[in-house]
Amino acid sequence: MMQSKIESIIEECRKYTREGEVASYIPELKKADKDALGIYIDKLDGNEFCAGDYDTKFTIQSISKIIALIIAIMDNGMEKVLSKVGVEPSAYSFNSIVTLEVKNANKPLNPMINAGAIATVSLIKGNSPEEIIERILEFTRKVTGNKNIKVNEEVYQSEKKTGDRNRSLAYFMKGTGIIEKDVEKVLDAYFQQCSIEVTCKDIAKIASFLANDGVLPSTGERIIPAEVAKIVKAVMVTCGMYDASGSFAVKVGIPSKSGVGGGILATVPGVMGIGVFGPALDKKGNSIAGVKILERLSEELNLSIF
């Protein structure tokens, strides 16, 4: 029943890909197939379902901000992280500099927009970009159970070449004391983090680990305290879908995080993790058909947490 349901939802939502565009500001992302669409569901009871282009690889992009936030909290405690990054929603686009200047004592509004994510990466322990990215990769491999996860070198170089907006955000934060480390090293780790290559299954596994409050459903091993998982899910609800987070909470009601690579990670507490992929994006930078799939799924299975 679940299998046929997700297959029909995928087909039903495929038409929406025509209304979106693949990300073009990072040249490598332009190469994505606009019509691709896939889903993977990892239920906490051990059942797994998938449909469409669920095994297509794509770069994690902003979904990695969840992982960076978890590691930063584990390294520093929540209080220290909150002294550098807020947890308030933003009405501006994900790469905006506006709020850094006019709000919040120069502190980025939240860890899910670029400025906040760069500040978060700067808090991860490690003396070099290599050390930091290795810790992020190690964590991602552990949680997904996929030892082959790695950085896509072409996308990383492409991000680095076109990352001037992110550089300006980072140097501004260095100037205001939010970032204490060497800016170029922090940015290098950030660009690599965004270029980690995953599939729907990988992000569904991260989502189910969060749905299970920090315990790996497959082994029963606790990776992070339940409290940290809860904090991350709360931030996902308020800030995870960029400046469309409010309408997404109303229509879908599932803690989620999107990325401009076309992925959306959605975590239904106590029930399941969902990974969706569709590189055609809406104006806010979210997968246009991916959002529709989650709307339909939430409606049909009554998944809203509200």
Curated annotation (Swiss-Prot):
List keywords of the entry alphabetically: Hydrolase
Q: Which GO terms describe its biological process?
A: glutamate biosynthetic process; glutamine catabolic process
Tell me the residue numbers annotated for binding substrate. Answer: 62, 114, 159, 166, 190, 242, 260
Give the EC number(s) listed in the UniProt record. 3.5.1.2
| Top-level taxon of the source organism | Bacteria
Which GO molecular function annotation, any one, does this entry have?
A: glutaminase activity
Pfam families the record matches: Glutaminase
> Which reaction is this enzyme known to catalyze?
L-glutamine + H2O = L-glutamate + NH4(+)
Task: Fetch the SUPFAM superfamilies from UniProt.
Answer: beta-lactamase/transpeptidase-like (SSF56601)
Q: Into which family does the record put it? A: Belongs to the glutaminase family.
How does this chain assemble? Answer: Homotetramer.
Q: What is this protein called?
A: Glutaminase
Provide the species name: Clostridium tetani (strain Massachusetts / E88)
* Gene name of the encoded protein: glsA
